[in-house]
Amino acid sequence: MTMTTNAERKFINLRKRLDQLGYRQPLAIESLPLVEKLFSDLIHTTESLRNAKLAAGKTEKESRNVDAILEPYKTENARLVKENNEMHLGLLKLREEKDRISRELKAYIRKLDHETSDLKFLNNQYVQKVRSLEKDSNGKTERILQLQEKNMQAVVQTPGGKKRSIPFRRQRMQTDELLPSSGGYVPPAVAQPDDPYIADLLQVADDRIQELQKEVAQLKLDLERAQGGIKHLNKQVEERDKEIERLNRALDGGRPHDVISLEAQNISNEKLIAHLNLQIEYLQETNRSLEQRVDSLQQKKKTVSSEVADLSARNQELCQELTQIDQLAQQLEKDKEMVLETADMELQEAKKAIQRQQRELEGQEEVISTLRRDMADGDHVKDQLRNQLLDLQDQNNKMEGLIHFLEEDKKRLQDKIEAMMQEDKEMVLELERMRARHGMCGKDHSPSRLDAFVKSLEEERNYYREEVERYRLVRGRTDRSPTPVGRGRSPRGRGSWHGKRDGDAELSRVVKERDELQSVLLGFEKHMEDIQTRVKLLTAERDQLSSQCQQAQEELRRVQRELESSELQRRIRDDREQTEAELQRVTAERDALRDRLKVAHSTALTDREQEEFRFLDLENTIEKLEREKADLRAQVTVLKESRVVVEKELKAQSAVLLQNVEEATQQRVESSALRLLQEQMEQSLSDVQHRLSVKTNELQAAHQQIDKLEEKIADLSRHGSSQKDEVVILQNTIASLDREKDTLQDAVDQKTESVVLLQQEVHRKEETLLEVRLTVTDLENSLNQLQAVLSSREREIASLRRQLDQSQEELFSVSRDREVALRENRRLQDDLATMTRENQAVHAEMQEALNERDELKLRVHSYISEVARIESLMAAKEQENRDMLERFRSIHTESEDKELKLQQSEGLNNSIRLELLSSDTERRHLRERVSLQDREIQEHLNALQAYEAQVSSLARAMSRLEEEVQAARAEKASVLADLASVRELCVKLDSSKELTVRQLTSKSMELERVTGELEDVRSEMELLKKQLGSERLTVRNLETLLSTNRQKEFQTHISASEKESELKVLKDRLALADSKTAGHAREVSQLRGKVSQLQTEMDVLKRQLTTERFERERAVQEMRRQGLSFSSLRSSSPLSTSLSPRPASPERSILRTPERSTDKTQDK
């Protein structure tokens, strides 16, 4: 069974496939394996055939695409060749540019070398000049010293008998009248035969001439070098032409080589002609500019000659002024004494000024201390005012918030009141309606119940209004609550009233509305309580602010009492008064606002019209407050600005005060130094005076000789004190003179250095002037030579112009013929290029169409193969379905699995069917596209036929053009014969042109060199003019400086010599005073020895007196004892009288000795 079923299945599949392929002949079961094998071979062969066709199509396509592949390589090759040519041209240009730059740099290096050589030469000249000037200055200084040593010296005899000579003391000689002028011949002062500068400048001129000759030789070498460079450039041009010919041969397609070479020759000829024209124009312009420069140089020569004459005259004037300077020196010596006297006066005035400044400094320090205290107080007041302003701003912000809050409450309450009024109206209307309705219906039953209910509602409304007004009036009594009374009064006759159902519903609604109104009133009462608490807070803040304002006012008054001294305090007081007034006004406005708020709170819920008016008033007040707030802000800004100004003024005053303090400190230091010196001198004086007083006290106790010595010592002490005072004064004057001497010496050194530098600059400028003169003469000679050369060159240029005109005419005729031929050739080439481009485009379109057709055929074959494959799959699937049906019959147990498989296979079948449908639709579309492509191919073929017709016509035109070209070639042969003759002429012209070009280049080089030299000369002339002007100014300044320096030198020299002499005199005086003081000290020591001897003698006399007294008393007692009278004792009185003066002196000495001892102890 299985074998038969397999054979049947194979037969059925094979039969289907044969039917699909169109083989509908009968098939026997016996031939089934053969046919199956043949069928498989057929399928294999068809697939191999299809693969072969595909391979063949691909190879054909690739062979067709070879040209298309090669085309970009060809274009790339052409582009690379073109870029190579461009790079080669760029290389040639870069080489030319490099050679040009190297030539320019070499020329510039040569120019710099020449300039450096010139500068070295000038430097050597200047060094030699400086050395000669230094030698001259050394000789002059030695001569001045010799003359000063030969001057008569003043001799001063000191008190010790010594004689001292004072050097550099200039002796003065007064003459009554001058010597009479000589009547003989006076030689002119201008003649200066032995001038060393002229010889030096002539040598410089000779050296310059030699350098210029060397430069001429160098320029000749440069010309030869330039000619060699021109030859090198010609060789480069020839090599470039050869390279162009090589590249033209290398190029494929395009224009013929002859046409390109002709164009290149024409372009080069045009460039040469344009270059020659430019050179001719440039030469004409250079000739004009050179003529103008020659004229300007002649004018400059005249001006330079006039300036030289002026300078020579100026030289004479300077010589005369030197003589005048010598005369001024004598006057300066006279002026010096006056200067010294004035210096002494100024010293005294300076001392007085120092004392006055000390007093002023003390006053300024007091002022500074007061100002600092004022500033500290002002800063304190400023901080307080700033804090008050901040508090006021905070209060304003709070008030604004309150006002906004009240406005919102006002709006909300207005809305509630309007709603309540509307509800009252509706209630009244309802009640009237109900009254009318119930009155009509139930007059007998309840005639006045509604009226009583309405009256109770009105009473409740009035009660609530009264309660609100009472709360508004009370303001702060929030503990009591009117709600129990309302609640006790409100339900008045609710239980006893019974009506209909409609009336009950309306009454319940009214009761609900009443309860809602009561809740609203309760909320409003709470809101009023909040407002009252806020008002309390505001009142507390107002009290606090008022207390702070009072404190600030008290502080301001205290500051006002303290700050009543200066303008700054006055300003601060004014600002403070303004701020106080503003604060009072702000507080008044704040109180007014609070009163208004109270009034607004008290009359908040009375009537709508009153509330509207009140809100309008509040808005106006708010606007006023905003305006006032803006004014306050403006005033605050003004106060801030004034504060800034005051701070700036304080800073300026503080800076001034700091400067004053620094100056005061400096003056204090100086005054302290002077005070220390003064105190030292006073101490020394007090010590000396004290010593002298001690000495006088000691000498007063001595004998008459000691009295005489005391008088002498007193005289000497007075003389010594006066001498010490003089010594102090002299020391001060010496110190001041030393300082002045140092300053004068520094000034003299500086002026001498500046004089030396100025003299060097003068000599340098004279040398440059002489060099400029020489260069001007050289330039004049060179200009004359150049004018001669230019005249000859102009004649040569005129002949060359005539030759160029002839050659240009011939070239114009040849160029016209050539341009005609070129135009025809270009036109033909353009036509050919357009035809070739069109043909290429048509071929490309044809190729694209064929490629698309092949692709479509391949797609159709692929679709057919896919359809066959899908059909075979469908057949296989159908066979499988049959097998599955047979299995379903045989195997019932696996029915569920098979059903699932069937469902899957059905889904696959459906998808395959959908794919087949889509493939059918695609096949139809492809057929349509193939038909369209066939139509397009037909159209392209028609277009090709038309293009072929055009090509044939173009071929005919080309044949005609070839005939014309042959005729043109014949004409060309004749033209070439003519061109040969023209070329011979051109060769001759080229040879003459090369000569002319060489001559022109040499002339251009020479002209450039001459123009460069002329520009250098012009710049040098301009520089010389500027230098002459500046030198004139410097000469004038130097003259004034020389005169002033010489005067100052004379003054300083004279003052220094006199001060030195005075210093020596003072030193001698000091030595004398020292010797005197030493002698006095020796005398004082001798006197002290004598005093000690006298004291010993006085002690001996005291002892003798005591012994005598004792003996006298004893004698008296003995005489009394013996009975002698007192008269008898008178006989011994001469002894006592003779000795009477002596006892007095010892007693006095005894009395004075302890005093002296006490004085000595005090001194110790």
From Swiss-Prot:
Question: According to its UniProt record, where is this protein mainly located?
Answer: cytoplasm
Provide the alphabetized UniProt keywords: Coiled coil, Cytoplasm, Cytoskeleton
Positions with biased composition (Low complexity) = 1122-1142
Residue numbers spanned by region Disordered: 475-505, 1121-1164
Q: Which Cys pairs does UniProt list as disulfide-bonded?
A: none
**Which CDD domains does the protein's record reference?**
cc_Cep135_MBD
Q: Where is the composition biased (Basic residues)?
A: 489-498
Tell me, in a sentence or two, what this protein's role is.
Centrosomal microtubule-binding protein involved in centriole biogenesis. Acts as a scaffolding protein during early centriole biogenesis. Required for the targeting of centriole satellite proteins to centrosomes. Also required for centriole-centriole cohesion during interphase by acting as a platform protein for cep250 at the centriole.
Q: Return the domain comment text from this UniProt entry.
A: Coiled-coil domains are critical for microtubule binding via the formation of a two-stranded coiled-coil structure in homodimers.
Could you describe the subunit structure of this protein? Homodimer.
Q: What is this protein called?
A: Centrosomal protein of 135 kDa
Q: Which species is this record about?
A: Danio rerio
What is the gene name? cep135
